[in-house]
Amino acid sequence: MTPEPAFLLHKRPYRETSALVELLTLSQGRVRAVAQGVQRPGSRSRGRLQPFSPLHVTWVGGGELKRLRLMESRGATALLAGEGLLCGLYANELLTRTLPVELPVSEVFAFYTALLEALPRPDARAGGLRRLEVSLLEALDALPRFTTPDGGELDPQVRYVLDAFSRAFRPGQPGLDGRTLRLLGAGDWDAPGLAGPSKAVTRAALAPLLGSRPLRSRELMRQLAERRRAKAGS
């Protein structure tokens, strides 16, 4: 096969010297594979197979679990720390948990690549995350419909909550006002003043896909925020 652009989403030890890996690839989406020998001391592939590092990979195997053959770097690893690192870990965990195996999601791949470029800049993180989340929801046919459950227009003066069954909005509290939701429905996900509402909508839309098990990366971000508040108040 032609070398495929990819990023590592998750890796865990397998047997003595190998690893089970989850990859996000350009044309095949999420791919599960065995990386043989990468845990062996001195393995050249060990240093390449790292999160946030652009890769070229090839694999063999017709089942769900592939065997990696080629692992080459195709660029510099994104250098992330603190909140930027936690946002990157969140993106990796989100994609691992929600993407079906081998569903082509080239737009998700493009927005993930753009996110890694944005994460070192604090002012660009939220917008990058929302664009990735929206592209993921679109790929999974789970993006909210910015209407009422019966297809009616949202009233700018009424507050709404997302109905998970219909993926539309019904009146409810505390909710978001119809004017804000109509702006989001027009695609203004990172317009000024919409950072909080867009985060609330994507989180609500992703919740049914994630199920009841919490994301570890969200807990780490909560702990970081608490430490910052405690430090600011001391």
Which residue stretches match the model-derived regions?
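Non-catalytic alpha-helical scaffolds and adjoining flexible linkers that form interface surfaces
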Residues: 1-20, 24-234
